[in-house]
Amino acid sequence: MDSETFIYLLWGGLAIALIVAAITDIKSRHISNWLNLAIALAAPVFWILSGMAFWPDMIGQIGLAAVILTIFAGMFAIGAMGGGDVKLLTALALWMHWLTFLELLLIMSIAGGVLTLLMMISKRIQKTEGPIKVPYGVAIAFSGLWTIWGIAGQSSQTIF
């Protein structure tokens, strides 16, 4: 199997993992550590197969993930985001160029806003008490899938 085929298989595996993350977040408001770890550990395989240079490419991906972890850990600390969501975003940051990841964050913000509005409407219709618990993993997964769809349409060698 050539490396480009394997790269597409990795993208497909990432897409499946994102769907699993969304489903489990809807069902239990939890994204498993093993799933986030699998996403993170598959990224270096992707880097090697796509021909990324150690410097600056691979180190840049690790740096991006560190920045994302730092920013979103702050969101977790103030209760604005769950830990699984933070880890999922950090793992996704290992897969994409920082400009592509900024697009993912923009799409995630829009999808998260729509999801929150839908949850608010649902709560009002059902007349339930308590705070709204938004399964933000759904917005993260949606934005990840949207981004993967765009990347997969390009040559796997040109995304970095």
What spans do the regions from the language model cover?
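A membrane-topology feature that recognizes alpha-helical transmembrane segments
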Residues: 1-160
